[in-house]
Amino acid sequence: MAEKREDIPTNVVKGDTVIWSKAYPARVVEIVGRTGTTGEVTQVIVEILEGKDAGRLIRRNVKGPVRVGDILMLRETEIEARPLEYSK
């Protein structure tokens, strides 16, 4: 059997309530473009508002409707999406 790792945070269930792992708010500053095979993913630039990376601008891929000024809750702030490549 696989051992349960203690260093990975898990969700806590108390009755009908689920407490998720820490998330950091980030504001959408710019919409870069659409990606995915059918354009279902939007690449955006966000400014992280809290945490150790507060004030940092990073590129993220977002699925679903999004517009400038929206607040996204990011579970991690270290990984950045690759820039879109446009064909000429």
Curated annotation (Swiss-Prot):
Highest taxon in the source lineage: Archaea
Protein family: Belongs to the eukaryotic ribosomal protein eS28 family.
Alphabetic keyword roster: Ribonucleoprotein, Ribosomal protein
UniProt GO cellular component terms: cytosolic small ribosomal subunit
Gene Ontology biological process terms from the UniProt entry: maturation of SSU-rRNA; ribosomal small subunit assembly; translation
Name of the gene encoding the protein in the UniProt record: rps28e
This protein's record includes keyword Acetylation: no
Name of this protein: Small ribosomal subunit protein eS28
Origin species: Nanoarchaeum equitans (strain Kin4-M)
